[in-house]
């Protein structure tokens, strides 16, 4: 197995500040709801020896990478190969968590090493399932079977892609001739109809985002998990959520607003964003927003 870790922990300094604000620093439970390769976990466990980690990761391939990467801390870690919403529905721990971290970004390993078609930069099968055994439909299934109307709605609703209508029409026309099987095929279909003069990012970016969100049921999992995260948070515990696009950030923002200020306190009025230096070192961090609250 290649042990190179692709992922850089986003907003790590801000997360460490949250941990340092915990009133008690002894035998605390830290749940990483989206363990990935373990980049956040490694940095946190190295710095704070009073934390024990519960690491949740649905993708068995990346979970094995995390176990190797975090081997030095194996005595302080319990792993769960599960979706985070399933874990919290059936919360298996005897005590509530003192710190819950949720990084909703897709690991760079999925883009660069998984061969599952998350990125249009490589020519790969158009799959995008984090776990093939629990996700019944692939991205290829969606683009080859959904109606033009359903494709247009999916692409717009899950990415705010303004050219969703022409993209969905192009997909439907192309598949009359040939089934779309790979990332490069789909990218070529999108590029052919996208006005490049209007493109601030790669024309395929938002469509790929929408497909990934749909395949893995990301927004529904987030909505299901929000009340479960705070339910399983100990008194004075902190929930920290990192989002990477406006749709999921709005869901988190609205949920935090709905909570009683007598029971929960937002750590900051506005989301915490990466510094210029962090963005310079780690370009994917540029869209990250951290929202956090404390259970009173």
UniProtKB/Swiss-Prot annotation:
The superkingdom of the source organism is Bacteria
Q: Which GO terms describe its molecular function?
A: rRNA (cytosine-N4-)-methyltransferase activity
Q: What is its EC number?
A: 2.1.1.199
Q: Which reaction does it catalyse?
A: cytidine(1402) in 16S rRNA + S-adenosyl-L-methionine = N(4)-methylcytidine(1402) in 16S rRNA + S-adenosyl-L-homocysteine + H(+)
Instruction: Name the GO terms of the biological process aspect.
Output: rRNA base methylation
Q: Does the keyword rRNA processing apply?
A: yes
Q: What keywords does the record list, in alphabetical order?
A: Cytoplasm, Methyltransferase, rRNA processing, S-adenosyl-L-methionine, Transferase
Enzyme class comes to: transferase
Binding of S-adenosyl-L-methionine occurs at 38-40, 57, 80, 103, 110
Keyword Methyltransferase tagged: yes
Query: Could you state one GO cellular component term attached to this entry?
Result: cytoplasm
Record's InterPro entries? RsmH, SAM-dep_MeTrfase_MraW_recog, SAM-dependent_MTases_sf
**Compartments where found:** Cytoplasm
Similarity comment text for this entry? Belongs to the methyltransferase superfamily. RsmH family.
Q: What does this protein do?
A: Specifically methylates the N4 position of cytidine in position 1402 (C1402) of 16S rRNA.
Q: Which PANTHER family is this protein grouped with?
A: 12S RRNA N4-METHYLCYTIDINE METHYLTRANSFERASE, S-ADENOSYL-METHYLTRANSFERASE MRAW
**UniProt cross-references to HAMAP family, sorted A to Z:** 16SrRNA_methyltr_H
Q: Spell out the protein name for this chain.
A: Ribosomal RNA small subunit methyltransferase H
Name of the coding gene: rsmH
């Amino acid at each position: 197995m290649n042990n190179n870790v692709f992922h850089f922990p986003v907003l790590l300094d801000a997360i460490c500040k949250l941990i340092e604000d915990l009133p008690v620093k002894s035998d605390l439970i830290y749940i990483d709801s989206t363990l990935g390769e373990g980049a956040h976990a490694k940095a946190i466990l190295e710095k704070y020896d009073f934390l024990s980690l519960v690491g949740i990761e649905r993708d068995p391939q990346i979970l094995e990478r995390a176990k190797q990467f975090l081997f030095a801390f194996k005595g302080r870690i319990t792993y769960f190969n599960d979706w985070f919403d399933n874990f919290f529905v059936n919360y298996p721990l005897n005590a509530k968590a003192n710190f819950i971290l949720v990084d909703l970004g897709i690991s760079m390993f999925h883009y660069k090493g998984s061969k599952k078609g998350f990125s249009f930069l490589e020519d790969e099968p158009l799959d995008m399932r984090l776990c093939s055994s629990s996700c019944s439909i692939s991205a290829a299934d969606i683009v080859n079977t959904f109606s033009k109307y359903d494709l247009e709605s999916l692409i717009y609703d899950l990415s705010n892609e303004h050219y969703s209508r022409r993209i969905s029409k192009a997909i439907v026309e192309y598949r009359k001739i040939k089934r779309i099987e790979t990332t490069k095929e789909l990218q070529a279909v999108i590029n052919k109809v996208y006005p490049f003069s209007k493109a601030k990012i790669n024309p395929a970016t938002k469509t790929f985002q929408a497909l990934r969100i749909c395949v893995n049921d990301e927004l529904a999992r987030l909505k299901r998990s929000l009340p479960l995260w705070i339910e399983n948070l100990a008194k004075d515990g902190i929930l920290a959520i990192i989002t990477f696009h406006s749709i999921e950030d709005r869901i988190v923002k609205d949920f935090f607003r709905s909570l009683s200020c007598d029971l929960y306190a937002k750590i900051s009025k506005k989301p915490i964003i990466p510094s210029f230096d962090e963005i310079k070192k780690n370009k994917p961090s540029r869209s990250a927003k951290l929202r956090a609250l404390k259970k009173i």
